[in-house]
Amino acid sequence: MCGDTGKHFNPFNVDKSSSPPNGQGSSDQYEVGDLSGKYGDLAMKTEVAGSFVDPSITLFGRLSIVGRAVVIHKSPVPHRWVCANIEPEGVREVKTAVATFTYPGSNIFDFHDNNKNSISYNNHI
């Protein structure tokens, strides 16, 4: 199952080969989804406790991690050991609306929600 997850979340196209060694750089020097890179790996450790605040990981907006997966790799040969999906609790309604006003006289409005309802309005003056 964990083999079905994709690569690290990397919306800023960070070149992993230019990232510092694990745990030695700032969070912006790693892929957003490379938590081991940012905070150090779990190799040769039987217990880890800590608290981390990562400004590049959000639960809302265009770069949200909701709907993505978290994967823990196991050593000595790194392989995907444990994974989970990050999903909102309960049912969440998502709506999007886009309004475009073009001078001298074109108005476009589009609305969509997760129930597949759509409203479109075009007015050309």
What annotation goes with each model-predicted range?
Residues 1-124:
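N-terminal leader/targeting pre-sequences
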